[in-house]
């Protein structure tokens, strides 16, 4: 009996070790892997499950997560809608937010979104300085004055103000942060590695599906 018990314990220990080594995690836990927002926020995705990524171009952790988010988007389920939201915690984050919305207004966000990240983190260009930003945009083939006009437009100013308010309303403590269905928040800090963050995101989506199925 002692021998059987020994081998049982050994097998369990080995199994746990293999699970840890393979990156398999236990079920997500509130407070450790995600939090519930104090008040649910309205979504803009209709019947789809809304996923928001709050980010800042200058954030190295956002930059690290970005390729994983892009890969996840390619296999995203049809019942899920994804949207980037540039966060604003401080005044020096506003230029990045306005840059994002100006690119959207000009219809070139998809073309230049990654390049903005690379310019900041690989080329070490401080795009929070407007003269450098405008010159850089011109080098990307965007007419300088056209970008300046979009950047300073009333519409972009309004969107930047809305991002500032959303950063407060969603109870953000930092970025990157992912909000699912206006209720569940996970972040790079909570998620661990970028891969862990994506796994938590996927499990939160499954959680929302199950909750909706019960209604």
Predicted regions and their residues:
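Periplasmic c-type cytochrome electron-transfer domains
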Residues: 27-37, 125, 130, 196, ...
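Solvent-exposed loop/turn segments at secondary-structure junctions
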Residues: 57-61, 88-92, 118-123, 155-156, ...
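Structural microenvironment flanking redox-active thiols in thiol-disulfide oxidoreductases
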Residues: 75-106, 110-138
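Alpha-helix N-cap/helix-start motif
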Residues: 62, 92-93, 126, 190, ...
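Extracytoplasmic/secreted envelope proteins and their assembly/folding machinery
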Residues: 66-73, 96-100, 113, 130, ...
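Extracytoplasmic thiol/disulfide redox context detector
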Residues: 2-94, 164, 206-215
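C-terminal cap of thioredoxin/glutaredoxin-like
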Residues: 3-5, 139-215
């Amino acid at each position: 009996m002692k021998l059987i018990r020994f081998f049982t314990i050994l097998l369990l220990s080995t199994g746990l070790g293999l699970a840890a080594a393979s990156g398999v995690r236990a079920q997500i836990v509130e407070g450790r892997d995600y939090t519930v927002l104090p008040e649910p926020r309205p979504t803009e995705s209709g019947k789809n499950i809304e996923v928001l990524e709050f980010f800042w171009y200058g954030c190295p952790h956002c930059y690290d997560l970005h390729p994983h988010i892009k890969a996840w988007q390619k296999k995203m389920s049809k019942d899920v809608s994804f949207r980037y939201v540039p966060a604003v915690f401080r005044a020096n984050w506003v230029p990045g937010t306005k840059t994002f919305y100006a690119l959207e207004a000009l219809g070139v966000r998809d073309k230049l979104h990654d390049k903005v990240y690379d310019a900041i983190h690989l080329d070490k260009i401080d795009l929070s300085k407007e003269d450098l930003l405008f010159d850089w945009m011109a080098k990307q083939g965007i007419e300088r004055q056209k970008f300046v006009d979009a950047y300073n437009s009333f519409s972009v100013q309004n969107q930047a103000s809305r991002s500032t308010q959303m950063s407060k309303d969603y109870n953000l403590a930092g970025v990157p942060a992912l909000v699912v269905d206006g209720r569940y928040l996970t972040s790079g800090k909570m998620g661990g590695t970028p891969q862990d963050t994506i796994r938590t995101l996927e499990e939160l989506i499954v959680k929302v599906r199950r909750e909706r199925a019960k209604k």
